[in-house]
Amino acid sequence: METVLVAGFLCVYDDNDINDNFYLPRRTIQEEINSGNGLNIPLNINHNENAVIGTVSSLSVYSTVCFVARVQSKEFLTIIKKIAAKSKLITNTEEKTLPPDPEIECLNSIFPGLSLSNRVGGNERDPFFKHVSICGVGRRPGTIAIFGRNLNWILDRFSSITEAEKEKILSTDQSCVQFFAEEQFKVDLYDLLADSLDTSYIKVRFPKLQSDKQLSGISKSTYIKASENLTANNHTINVNSKVTKETEATDSVSQDDCAVHAPDLISTICSTTHTTHHDLVRMNGSATGNSASLPAPQFSECVFLPKDTFCSLLNATAGAQNKNVTPAAPIFKTDEYITPYPESLSRVDYGNRMNYHIPPPYWYPSMPGFNYKSYRGSQKRCAPTDSDDEMSFPGDPDYTTKKKKRYREDDDRELTKDKNDIKELVDAIGMLRHEISALKYIRSQSPQRQHCTAVDTMPTIEEKNVASPKPSVVNASLTPGQDRNQNLMQSDQSLLSLNKKLFVEALNKMDN
């Protein structure tokens, strides 16, 4: 694969309108070059560090900062070669003196700008030159790139480079030993397509390239698609304002004059790019109207207009032409539809709405809100209490209803319930006393009274069982008197223990 070189200016010191943010001090650049930091600087695409395509072989400072680099990435050159083979306009150059080289022309068309990435402040130990990028257009004035196969041919394109400076650049380039690894180029065709898409959104690209070409002193034929060299003083472009001097005179023209000369101005503006309408017609072999018979105007005849002025000229031209207006459909009047029932206003014809009687809205009295909370409270069941499960005694007036669920509605019912519980306890104690008195009376009438002790000193069944052990011998006699006395005593003891148990439970309940 043949060698591809690129050269150009990274900064032009003769320009007085340079921005301070992009200013490169001449003394700092010279010191960095003398210290050997100006060689083997990476060359990439649009400041993408993953798209390194070569290295810088020469960097020198004169009236400009001139650099020379070699494109060494084989994969990148293969992509450019395929793009150039697919393009139908890339080899259609007006300059027949240049040798046909689709790859070089493709590189000059896609990446005509240069940009140097350098250190601004920060750590002084970091390298001053970070990388050089080829791009769609550079920010610094005069930063335009020229690709070629021969370095002498590239340097001859710049009229501002003297013969002595050219010899120094050639000697520095030949003595430089370059190192490049193919792994540094990590992008593909989609990344390059995205860069081209971003470049197409730059509005001032072509005026900036025209100014850079004039400022760099490129006088001979090149592959750059940045229009012809500007020589007329009346058409000198101001980079900051991006408006020609003839624009001021155009603004003072009246609206009638603009309408008369609008077709000429429009055809003149369309010829500012390198590929004019005349060229496209000549390539395709056909045209509409009389456009094919009109010669392509020269660049000195071009007039640059602001966007607002151009749009106003288009509107004036469109208004002056006769237009066949399509008549609108006739509007037929519709009869009013009368119904025996009143309709809503939206269903009445628009023309009859003013005469339509709308009844006033009916006023409904406000209804008091329903007290839902009180209704829920009255139907809510109270929490169960211990009194619901207590034992009932015979003779109790609430004996049959004591197991039913109770509900309390307010505090008065709760107080009444507490009083009833106390009354029940008093009645139970009275019944226990009555039972004890009856038991004492029965015991006093028993014929075996002398064998019984008093109730107050009589031990319980548990104490009797503990105190008196069971007899070891059981008699099987049928003495009627003894069995009767034993059965009576056992019934008395069981009834007494039951009453005591109930009495203890009643006392425990009163304590709680």
From Swiss-Prot:
Protein name per the record: Capsid scaffolding protein
Lineage: Viruses, Duplodnaviria, Heunggongvirae, Peploviricota, Herviviricetes
GO CC field: host cell cytoplasm; host cell nucleus
Entry annotation: catalytic residues: H47, S115, H131
Enzyme class at the top of the EC tree: hydrolase
UniProt remark on domains: Region of interaction between pPR and pAP is called Amino conserved domain (ACD). The region of interaction with major capsid protein is called carboxyl conserved domain (CCD).
Source organism per UniProt: Human herpesvirus 7 (strain JI) (HHV-7)
Stretch list, region Interaction with pAP: 264-282
Family, as annotated: Belongs to the herpesviridae capsid scaffolding protein family.
Alphabetic keyword roster: Host cytoplasm, Host nucleus, Hydrolase, Phosphoprotein, Protease, Serine protease, Viral capsid assembly, Viral release from host cell
Origin: domain of life: Viruses
Alphabetical GO biological process terms: nuclear capsid assembly; proteolysis; viral release from host cell
HAMAP family for this protein: HSV_SCAF
Motif Nuclear localization signal: where in chain: 402-408
Pfam family, one: Peptidase_S21
SUPFAM superfamilies referenced in this protein's UniProt entry, alphabetically: Herpes virus serine proteinase, assemblin
Record bears the keyword Phosphoprotein: yes
Chain intervals for the UniProt region annotation (Disordered): 376-407
EC number(s) from the headed UniProt entry: 3.4.21.97
Stored InterPro entries: Herpes_virus_sf, Peptidase_S21
Residues flagged as site, Cleavage: A226, S227, A476, S477
Region annotation Interaction with major capsid protein: where it falls in the sequence: 492-512
A GO MF term: serine-type endopeptidase activity
